From Swiss-Prot:
It catalyses: Endonucleolytic cleavage of RNA, removing extra 3' nucleotides from tRNA precursor, generating 3' termini of tRNAs. A 3'-hydroxy group is left at the tRNA terminus and a 5'-phosphoryl group is left at the trailer molecule. It comes from the Bacteria. This is Ribonuclease Z. The active site is at 67 (proton acceptor). Its cofactor is Zn(2+). One of its GO terms (molecular function) is zinc ion binding. Zn(2+) 2 binds at residues 67-68, 216, 274. The gene is rnz.
């Protein structure tokens, strides 16, 4: 499981940072890639990676500002060129209006897609648990921005314990159907009368990962709730230390506010993104160092950077 950042800038493309988009790579878990936001130029950024557009099965949009959605029609069209290899439908989750935006762009440009898009639109009254599969659950909550904006909490369900096959073999259990029964948690009786207790040969379930990905937001308690105990919190850092007033007026956060959210939520790691173009080079280093004074496990990410979870 990895996060790769396709765009880490704020507002408009810059030389060092494209606008917002990241992918959550779940290839080992479910052979899928999930995209979060799709700003202008996202498909160009993908060309610099190993990401296959047809592997992108779900797209989560935080809000309808252009730097988070203007790349979506282009990406969907480019994805169509690979659809003949593997016909794969796509789910798009986002605020009310995302369907109209996408369909209008495709219709007016005469674009035809050889796959279906399933839209899931939300307003403030329909948030909470928005998606569930056998391996993942996704929650959404309203943040505090200048327009309706969501944050997402991706929860991996606990992983089953693994079978200690070597110990089972040493106990005299023949490989075959009995192995399968023990793996499924069933106690078995051997021909010599000994009972094999399944739980003695299966490790404890492994806790699933929690990944919190927030859209643009002022400092808000909703961010804390979404990030409670998260393994990774991705939080915007449009402004730096001392910029709290201007951040609030524009519906954004500073690096220090993001660090405080991570601390209050008891998150394990904080990744800062959505950085204003006025922060470059040493300024970015200082932004990260300042945040570390509040939350030590902080990192300010760069475009195309991959982070393991």
């Amino acid at each position: 499981m990895e996060i790769q950042f396709l765009g880490t800038g704020a507002g408009q493309p810059a030389k060092a940072r494209n606008v917002s988009s990241l992918v959550l790579k779940l290839l080992d878990e479910i052979n899928e890639v999930w995209m979060f936001d799709c700003g202008e130029g996202t498909q160009r950024q993908i060309l610099e990676t190993t990401i296959k557009p047809r592997k992108v099965k779900k797209i989560f949009i935080t809000h309808m500002h252009g730097d988070h959605v203007f790349g979506l029609p282009g990406f969907l069209s480019s994805r169509a060129f690979q659809a003949n290899e593997e016909q794969t439908d796509l789910d798009i989750y986002g605020p009310v209006g995302i369907k109209s935006f996408v369909m209008t762009a495709l219709r007016t440009s005469g674009s035809r897609l050889p796959y279906r898009i399933h839209f899931h639109e939300f307003d403030e009254s329909s948030l909470g648990k928005i998606m569930e599969t056998d391996k993942f659950t996704v929650y959404a909550e309203k943040l505090d921005h200048t327009i309706f904006c969501m944050g997402y909490r991706v929860v991996q369900k606990d992983l089953e314990g693994t079978l200690d096959a070597e110990a089972l073999k040493l106990a005299g259990v023949p490989f075959g159907p009995l192995f399968g029964k023990v793996k499924n948690g069933e106690n078995v009786t051997l021909e010599d009368g000994r009972e094999i207790i399944a739980k003695d040969y299966i490790s404890e379930p492994k806790k699933g990962k929690v990944i919190t990905i927030l859209g643009d937001t002022r400092k808000t308690d909703a961010s804390i709730r979404l990030a409670l105990g998260a393994d990774v919190l991705v939080h915007e850092s449009t402004y730096g230390k001392g910029d709290e007033r201007i951040a609030k007026s524009h519906g954004h956060s500073t690096n220090m506010q993001a660090a405080d959210i991570a601390k209050q939520a008891n998150a394990k790691r904080l990744l800062l993104n959505h950085v204003s173009a006025r922060f470059m080079g040493r300024d970015c280093w200082q932004m990260e160092e300042d945040a570390k004074t509040i939350f030590s496990n902080t990192h300010l990410v760069r475009d195309l950077e991959e982070v393991g979870i």
